[in-house]
């Protein structure tokens, strides 16, 4: 049986981690999976992974001993495939994997850019070196979206190594006969700066003051962050507590998407936005920011997508028009993000002897 080791910083409930766990569930009988957490820390998904029979190894990539321990681990477990998801630090992972004679070395980019390098010249220089190492020592380089494919390594030394594979979702069993609550609004995602939930407070405020319209937005996702605390504080200061309903982190946000009519998504940065895809699959009317990553998804669901610049009044005006039923909405079906397609592509890559 082929042995595959996934590399993550920590197996918390993020999009890349959840989508990877979904593929492992489907392929668990055909491959032996391991996970290496390079933060050296346990994650929120560890218990579930261990219940699936997946071994998790904890090694701190910041420690001097990491390279030696990682190579030793790969050799001891006879790993055939290393599948790394830790952005440009995958360069170090693949160099070490090459040294350990791992046959298939996959680097998988799950975002479209490193937002931290913009103001850090040292990090930018470091990333340039790591990009070259990734190209040389990876046997396959995967991207979560075409935008990521174009942005992250624009000058490709080995074009045949590079491939876009969309995240997969279970869509064949979705029952579309759910009842939507009229004029119900939802946001799904953890509270961090790039998700831009504070923007929605501005939208709520303009709707109230300029359009005489009250809406309530349900927020599903981890709010136990510094940004989440800031969000709650500002909502309280502005007297908007009655306009927000905070659910927090849940195991299955789909139950909330099924009954919600509108999905709001003002992100400033995404890889391939999983929550956005799930919202489309559950026939939500989507109002999203017009970043390229969102556009790549929305192109498959044009009739129910409204892409807007991040201007609060524009969003407020659009919401007012939609709830006044001045626009007729129809929904498109698309299997582009079917998990069975994703799983088949990964299976072929894992089994390939010459990439």
Curated annotation (Swiss-Prot):
Keywords: Capsule biogenesis/degradation, Exopolysaccharide synthesis, Glycosyltransferase, Transferase
Keyword Glycosyltransferase carried by entry: yes
Pathway involvement of the protein, from the record: Capsule biogenesis; capsule polysaccharide biosynthesis
GO BP: any one term: capsule polysaccharide biosynthetic process
CDD domains xrefs: GT4_CapH-like
Record Pfam families: Glyco_transf_4 (PF13439), Glycos_transf_1 (PF00534)
Molecular function GO labels: glycosyltransferase activity
InterPro entries in the record: Glyco_trans_1, Glyco_trans_4-like_N
Entry EC no(s): 2.4.-.-
EC category: transferase
Entry similarity comment: Belongs to the glycosyltransferase group 1 family. Glycosyltransferase 4 subfamily.
Function as written in the Swiss-Prot or TrEMBL entry: Required for the biosynthesis of type 1 capsular polysaccharide.
The protein's name in its UniProt record: Capsular polysaccharide biosynthesis glycosyltransferase CapH
Origin species: Staphylococcus aureus
Native organism taxonomy: Bacteria, Bacillati, Bacillota, Bacilli, Bacillales
């Amino acid at each position: 049986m082929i042995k595959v080791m996934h590399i993550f910083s920590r197996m918390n409930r993020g999009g890349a981690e959840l989508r990877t766990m979904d593929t492992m569930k489907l392929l668990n009988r055909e491959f032996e999976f391991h996970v290496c957490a390079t933060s050296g820390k346990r994650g929120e998904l560890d218990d579930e992974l261990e219940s699936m029979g997946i071994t998790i190894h904890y090694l701190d990539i910041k420690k001097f001993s990491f390279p030696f321990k990682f190579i030793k681990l790969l050799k001891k477990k006879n790993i055939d495939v290393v599948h790394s998801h830790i952005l440009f630090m995958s360069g170090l992972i693949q160099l070490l994997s090459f040294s350990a004679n791992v046959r298939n070395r996959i680097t998988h980019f799950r975002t479209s850019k490193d937002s931290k390098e913009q103001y850090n010249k040292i990090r930018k220089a470091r990333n340039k070196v790591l990009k070259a190492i990734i190209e040389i020592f990876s046997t396959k380089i995967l991207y979560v979206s075409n935008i990521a494919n174009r942005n992250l390594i624009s000058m490709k030394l080995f074009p045949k190594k590079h491939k876009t594979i969309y995240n997969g979702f279970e869509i064949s069993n979705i029952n579309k006969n759910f009842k939507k609550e009229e004029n119900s609004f939802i946001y799904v995602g953890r509270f961090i700066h790039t998700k831009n939930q504070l923007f929605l407070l501005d939208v709520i405020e303009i709707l109230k003051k300029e359009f005489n319209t009250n809406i309530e937005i349900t927020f599903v996702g981890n709010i136990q962050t510094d940004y989440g605390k800031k969000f709650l504080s500002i909502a309280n200061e502005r007297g908007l507590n009655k306009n927000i309903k905070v659910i927090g982190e849940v195991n299955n946000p789909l139950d909330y998407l099924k009954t919600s009519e509108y999905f709001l998504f003002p992100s400033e940065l995404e890889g391939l936005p999983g929550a956005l895809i799930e919202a489309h699959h559950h026939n939500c009317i989507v109002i999203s920011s017009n970043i390229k990553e969102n556009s790549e998804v929305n192109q498959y669901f044009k009739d129910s997508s409204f892409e807007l610049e991040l201007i609060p009044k524009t969003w407020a005006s659009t919401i007012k028009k939609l709830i006044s039923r001045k626009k007729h909405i129809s929904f498109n079906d698309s299997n582009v993000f079917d998990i069975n397609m994703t799983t088949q592509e990964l299976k072929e890559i894992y089994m390939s002897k010459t990439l």
